[in-house]
């Protein structure tokens, strides 16, 4: 079996910082142009990590070949096969490409006295290295990524602000105050998303998903009614009275009544086939989630 060839050196652009597996002595010698390290076509050849002659660790220089193989198979027909030699060739090319682009972007950051390489730096480096044809599509991917990250930050920030407001007022968590404020949680938020997904089947069958929850003390009942086609779940918290008996009546369907039970309570099987039970417990920003029981009258 043909053995994999091992390289005892790596190429990095002149002036770029040494890679993680390069020793400080080798990097200093390369920058000074001595110590047995030569340069070729504007690139400095660094010795292997620490020992000079010892090659760098393979896992530090190359992407996992299994990942490379999976990516290659995505572009091939189902009956196509890939030789070991082709996998290793792509693995080495892609790994070296990452080193070249990162080194070029690092030079730009050093000139601008910045420590963090961002996506724009990498796209600039690819343009400098002659990959202009790929920069356009990658810019669109970068913009999509930033938009997704921005939306995620907005959702998390909005949920955190609502929780802080509840803590500050002390109406539902501190036991004081006669009413509870309504809270709107986006469907993409982890907990709200779980609620909307778990009740999606009920929305298909019953035309509406109903759930109730209690927050903090025992006098603030909260319920929601998710309309069809809506990705945002609106929670409303009417003031609980003695007559309501810890029940939340969800708008739009008068036959749906939600009863609250403690976390330690036992689950009861609903009579007939129409009753479905939902139980979950957790603690988020001081909000205590209680076991819920859904009854159909």
From Swiss-Prot:
Cellular localisation: Nucleus; Cytoplasm
Induction annotation: Circadian-regulation under long day (LD) conditions. Expression increases in the middle of daytime, peaks around the end of the light period and gradually decreases during the dark period and beginning of daylight.
Gene Ontology CC: CCAAT-binding factor complex; cytoplasm; nucleus
The organism of origin for this protein: Oryza sativa subsp. japonica
Residue ranges flagged as DNA-binding region: 63-69
GO BP: any one term: flower development
Chain segments carrying region Disordered: 1-25
Region annotated Subunit association domain (SAD), chain positions: 90-101
Signal peptide: none
Keyword Transcription in record: yes
Protein name: Nuclear transcription factor Y subunit B-11
Keyword set includes Mitochondrion: no
This protein's UniProt keywords: Cytoplasm, DNA-binding, Flowering, Growth regulation, Nucleus, Transcription, Transcription regulation
Phenotype upon gene inactivation: Early flowering phenotype under long day (LD) and natural day (ND) conditions. Decreased plant size, number of grains per panicle, yield and dry weight per plant.
Gene: HD5
GO molecular function, one term: DNA-binding transcription factor activity, RNA polymerase II-specific
InterPro entries listed in its UniProt record: CBFA_NFYB_domain, Histone-fold, Transc_fact_NFYB/HAP3, Transcrpt_fac_NFYB/HAP3_CS
Family: Belongs to the NFYB/HAP3 subunit family.
Tissue: Expressed in roots, culms, nodes, leaf blades, leaf sheaths and young panicles.
């Amino acid at each position: 079996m043909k053995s994999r060839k091992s390289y005892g050196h790596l190429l990095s652009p002149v002036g770029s910082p040494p890679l993680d597996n390069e020793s400080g002595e080798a990097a200093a010698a390369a920058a000074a142009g001595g110590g047995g390290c030569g340069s070729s076509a504007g690139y400095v050849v660094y010795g292997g990590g620490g020992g000079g002659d010892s090659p760098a660790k393979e896992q530090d220089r190359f992407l996992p070949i299994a990942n490379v193989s999976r990516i290659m198979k995505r572009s091939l027909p189902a009956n196509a096969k890939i030789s070991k030699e082709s996998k290793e060739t792509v693995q080495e090319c892609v790994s070296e490409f990452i080193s070249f682009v990162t080194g070029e972007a690092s030079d730009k950051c050093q000139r601008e006295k910045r420590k963090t390489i961002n996506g724009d730096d990498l796209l600039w480096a690819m343009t400098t290295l002659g990959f202009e044809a790929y920069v356009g599509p990658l810019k669109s991917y970068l913009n999509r990524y930033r938009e997704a990250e921005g939306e995620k930050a907005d959702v998390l920030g909005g949920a955190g602000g609502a929780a802080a407001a509840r803590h500050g007022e002390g109406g539902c968590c501190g036991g004081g105050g006669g009413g509870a404020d309504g809270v709107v949680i986006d469907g993409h938020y982890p907990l709200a998303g779980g609620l909307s997904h778990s009740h999606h089947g009920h929305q298909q069958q019953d035309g509406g998903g109903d759930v109730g929850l209690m927050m903090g003390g025992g006098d603030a009942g909260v319920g929601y009614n998710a309309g069809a086609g809506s990705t945002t779940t609106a929670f409303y918290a009417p003031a609980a009275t003695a007559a309501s008996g810890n029940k939340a009546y969800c708008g739009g369907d008068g036959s749906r009544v939600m009863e609250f039970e403690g976390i330690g309570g036992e689950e009861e099987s609903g009579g007939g086939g129409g009753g479905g039970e939902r139980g979950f417990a957790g603690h988020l920003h001081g909000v205590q989630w209680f076991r819920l029981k859904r009854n159909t009258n």
